[in-house]
């Protein structure tokens, strides 16, 4: 299997972001917290976003400083290593 290009990784990020918007459309904070399926789906998408961002080279990241690379990596780390902080997901979704 050939490695994915940074452009393909960026497409993955954009697709996951659209999925998060679709999954949470019309939800408020309470609705989100009461829906474990949506919580898990959103967590998976954010984890995927973080993994895709991590695979993009520093050179590419430096070319696009306006992209919140560190935030993408950070949310992935929270989800993987501090999974008990899931409530912070909706704050990210709302932005």
Protein language model regions, located:
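Solvent-exposed interaction patches of small proteins and small membrane subunits
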Residues: 1-95
């Amino acid at each position: 299997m050939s490695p994915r290009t940074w452009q393909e990784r960026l497409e993955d990020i954009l697709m996951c972001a659209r999925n998060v918007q679709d999954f949470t459309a019309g939800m408020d904070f309470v609705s989100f917290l009461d829906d474990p399926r949506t919580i898990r789906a959103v967590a998976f998408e954010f984890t995927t976003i973080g993994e895709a961002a991590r695979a993009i080279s520093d050179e590419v990241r430096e070319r696009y400083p306006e992209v919140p690379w560190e935030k993408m990596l950070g949310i992935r780390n929270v989800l993987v290593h501090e999974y008990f902080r899931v409530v912070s997901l909706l704050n990210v979704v709302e932005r």
